[in-house]
Amino acid sequence: YYPELGMRQMSDNDILYDAAFRKTMQQYMLSQGYTLGAKKAYEDDYFKLPVYNYEMHLSLFGNNDSDFSQYFQNIEERLIRNGYLCCFTDEDFYLYFMAHAAKHYRSGGTGLRHLLDCYVFLSKKRDTMDWNYLHCELEKLGLVDFERDSRLLAEKVLTDQPVTLTEPESKMLDFLTCSGTYGALGTYAQNEFQKTMQKVQQNDAHPSKLKYVWHRLFPDDDFYQNYSMFCYRHKWARPFYTVYRLVRLCLTKSRRKKVRLEAKLLQKK
């Protein structure tokens, strides 16, 4: 959709494929010189020097994005088939684009590139899409406000005419500007802290800091289903996975920084 190749860089390529071929996919990617990174319930990450990064998806969203995951669970039924290739309709692509952006926006944040993507796509496809269908589906996804705010802000920011932003638009633009390309660690830590605290509060109306720490060390089934299917199926292995997480924490600077931010938030409670 961009005017020239190379104007839009991506950190990875997301490809949805038939889960029945997961082992076949792994064998093929490894035979092509790729290294298997994170292996989650819904995706496998493959890396190859100098810059190749593929996220091979069994589903488009994990269980921690339950609303989006359920909506896109049977997306294959709505794809356009061309031989072995399956593609979104323009409308369904736009819905996925907004859901994917909202996922990052509500987690660690996302950068100004979101507005540019929105502007470029709509410049090409706005007049040919079925907006009645889009409004109906956006409502199911709970993204009516996010889509409208993104679209209107993109139009205002990227126009060559002087415009005045509303206060909510200014706040959204400030957030996108300060989120870098892939979000900010501080934002991610704060949002994850709130999500975890909500889970703890479901079981205890007055959760203590100790219970929060306990939940972080020994999370619920949803965590293991997303990050370690082996531990999800075999509960006896979970203590060993906890040890692995602690060792990984000690060896990874970004994870240590996130935990320090999380600890500061917990102290304020």
PLM-predicted stretches and their roles:
Residues Y1-S11, Y17-K269:
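Conserved NTP-donor binding/palm subdomain of two-metal-ion nucleotidyltransferases/polymerases, i.e.
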